[in-house]
A protein has these predicted regions:
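Intrinsic-disorder/low-complexity signal
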Residues: 1-221
Length: 221
């Protein structure tokens, strides 16, 4: 059974068998907004673009690497987005610009796959975060999305999870109402093992740049 993540909660990365969890996915599943028009006789689908990202830090809190959508153009102010970490331990499946159009299909729209065995030795922590992108269709907050959740699971990106280890339901959390960015949690090294700490801090950030700066400043150690 998946752990419903709460702020400040820490979990051990272990399978039900007791073996260490080293290969897993961090995914986000969300739905587009269905608006009824003309007294309910027709509908309009509002595309919702969420962006799942992560940043990697060394023990001193310096940025080592990052993953965020290559579609972001920061005009040289921040590194260009990319889908793979330099050590190829983490991979992003690509940017979903719309959300589920026909209801929840049980699959995540964006996924970052993680292989802890390949993470560079100088990476001490990995912070995962989520943003709402201001597209022409939707510029609201998490509470306006029909469903949105982040989860850690064992499996592959294109199939239902074998086992869900932890889940955070973003759209239903009262602390996420009125917010547009979420710092989900942090993987970190402790005594030679990897641990996971749920953060669950939500913010009103209007752009991913604000969140990137915030994560580097407040969550790097």
């Amino acid at each position: 059974m998946a752990i419903r993540l709460e702020k400040g909660q820490r979990i051990n990365l272990e399978k039900e068998s007791g073996t260490k969890l080293t290969n897993f996915c961090v995914g986000c599943n969300w739905g587009a907004i269905i608006e009824k028009k003309f007294f309910g006789l027709s509908t309009h689908v509002v595309d919702v673009d969420l962006d799942l990202s992560c940043m990697m830090f060394d023990a001193a809190g310096n940025v080592v690497d990052h993953i965020w959508s290559p579609l972001y153009n920061f005009r040289g102010k921040l590194p260009q987005g990319k889908l793979d970490s330099n050590d190829h331990a983490l991979h992003h499946t690509g940017d979903d610009l719309t959300g589920d159009q026909n209801g929840d299909d049980g699959l995540d729209n964006e996924i970052i796959t993680v292989d802890l065995n390949r993470v560079s030795s100088n990476v001490n922590s990995i912070v995962f975060f989520l943003n709402i992108y201001n597209n022409s269709e939707y510029s609201g907050d998490f509470s306006g999305i029909p469903y949105a959740s982040i989860r850690m699971f064992e499996g592959t990106p294109n199939r239902p999870p074998k086992q869900v280890f932890a889940q955070y339901n973003v759209a239903t959390k009262t602390e996420c109402a009125g917010k547009r960015a979420l710092v989900m949690g942090k993987l970190y090294r402790r005594n030679g093992d990897w641990k996971f700490a749920a953060i669950g801090d939500a913010f009103e950030d209007r752009t991913i740049v604000e969140t990137i700066v915030r994560v580097a400043r407040d969550y790097s150690k």
